[in-house]
A protein has these predicted regions:
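Conserved mixed alpha/beta catalytic, RNA-binding, or beta-rich assembly cores of soluble enzyme
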Residues: 1-55
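C-terminal binding/interaction regions
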Residues: 41-127
Length: 127
């Protein structure tokens, strides 16, 4: 089965892909939110207003931390967390070169990742 992830106002594509894959593996409905926007928005505020990031979208590491927090009170988020070991050995492909943080998360989850040799943005240099 092919699972996709795309950029939204809240999440980067890698983060969305991981959440969508966990939903599929856990039999969780696509429409179900695993992380409420009310949890994501303060993280975005922290990133942009206090830590100086320009991109408010959560990377995969930040989404996994948020998911683990939600899992304490939400059974569906807890079910999704239990699917993490099942990602090992799966294949993922990105049509752009991913940020190092997302590449690192895929590596730690033991997901086999390939990327097209195209940058996601024209901002090739970071402050």
């Amino acid at each position: 089965r092919i699972v996709t992830g795309k950029t939204t106002n809240l999440l980067g594509p890698s983060a969305a892909l991981i959440l969508n894959a966990l939903k599929v593996l856990g039999g969780i409905e696509k429409k179900d939110q695993l992380i409420s926007p009310t949890v994501i928005e303060p993280i975005q505020t922290l990133k942009c207003d206090y830590l100086g990031n320009r991109n408010p979208r959560l990377h995969s590491d930040e989404v996994l931390v948020a998911l683990s927090i939600c899992a304490a009170t939400d059974p569906k988020a807890a079910l999704a967390m239990r699917q993490l070991p099942l990602l090992e050995g799966l294949e993922a492909h990105s049509t752009v070169i991913l940020p190092q943080v997302d590449e690192g998360i895929f590596r730690r989850l033991k997901v086999n990742l390939t990327c097209d040799p195209k940058y996601q943005s024209h901002n090739l240099y970071h402050k």
